[in-house]
Amino acid sequence: MIRLRLLAVTLGFFASGTVFAADLPRAKPEEVGMSSERLARIGEVLKADIAAGRIPGAVIAIARHGKLVALDAHGWRDKAAGVAMTTDTIFNIASMTKPMVTVGALMLYERGQLLIGDPLSKYFPKFSNMKVAARDANGEPTAETVPAVRQITIQDLMRHTSGIIYGGRGNTLVHKMYPAGSGDASREYDGAAFVDKLASLPLLYQPATVWDYGFGLDLLGLTIEKISGQALGQYLKASLFTPLGMNDTGFAISPDQAARYARPLPNDPDTGKPQARSPELTQPLKFECGGGCAASTASDYLRFAMMLMNQGRSGEARLLGPRTVAYMLSDQLGPNIKNLIGNADPTRADYGFGLGLAVRTTPGVVKMMGSIGQFSWPGASGTDWWADPKEELAVVYMSAAPGPLRWHYRQVINALVYQAIVD
């Protein structure tokens, strides 16, 4: 059944994201070990780049020691239409959907309804006897296949070790067989057809041997639907979004939310080529993809980040047990799985990977600052977030700025936030 992203307002669900600023305690930067003068550099850099036409606008939300330090909007929500950015602007968060879907699955795990070691074929039998592309003398995949040595598991979906890939992230024979990405696939296939398509394709790698980016979280979302008997968005709304007060987060965009939706610049600032103007608002989703089809606000997503940093608790509500969160945030790759995270996000090369997100395993080596245990995962449309439990720091940065520039701003925002910590 086709689900349109543009739906009628559901009574009581679509409250303004600015409510968050009222119910989270605020603090002056100096009260939580940060410098107002240094934090102001974020706005200075963003305003200069907005004026130079590099990005349309941005919203940044920062919390430290459980208190809101900054919730600021800069530039344009829709520059072409002359609409200014506001803190309740809604963004396509793309792969920032993945950690939320992982949390939704772990809730089923805590109820005994889903096991991390379950084979995917338990829920979708067509994945029972997968084939893997054979390699030629140069190590390149060929049209020949060999049997998978073991089943794909739920853990493989969560940590991107299933061998199932995104077609748009390579040029091999196998990549050309796969859909390009989550958004494209969700507009081309319904859930059943999507499962049939992926189950018919060879894996690029044997399961549990290589981290490579792909459709694992989309399949996890469909697994959640099968277990819960609900659409993914409906399940996450009841179990995650509503308990956290994430009232502007979901897969369905109301008319009110569409009016608050951030749009990219008409042309890519680097190449000058036209950019897609938010096709997710006009093209129907045939299934709610767990890999990248949600929208949210900076303040909503900050709630989610802080819940994980607070070991599964938000106020009086406990969404996950602390040991489940610790397991989610632990490195799931180890020494025997080849780590290609840097191919998906060069700024997170040398990170480890937990369940649904990257985890930092060293204070150095990586291109960005952060403590061991920092966790994150960005979105290809220009959004990013991270939480650093050691620093009690959570940051969400949102901009409608797809393309290679997003890697630049991930590093810029990281540097500008950490340099403002002075305690």
Feature-to-residue mapping (PLM):
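Short, conserved catalytic-motif segment at the N-terminal edge
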Residues: 22-93, 113-115, 129-137, 277, ...
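Short, surface-exposed loop or secondary-structure junction motifs
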Residues: 25, 119-372
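Active-site SXXK
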Residues: 40-47, 60, 66, 71, ...
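Short, well-ordered beta-strand elements
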Residues: 385-386, 392-401
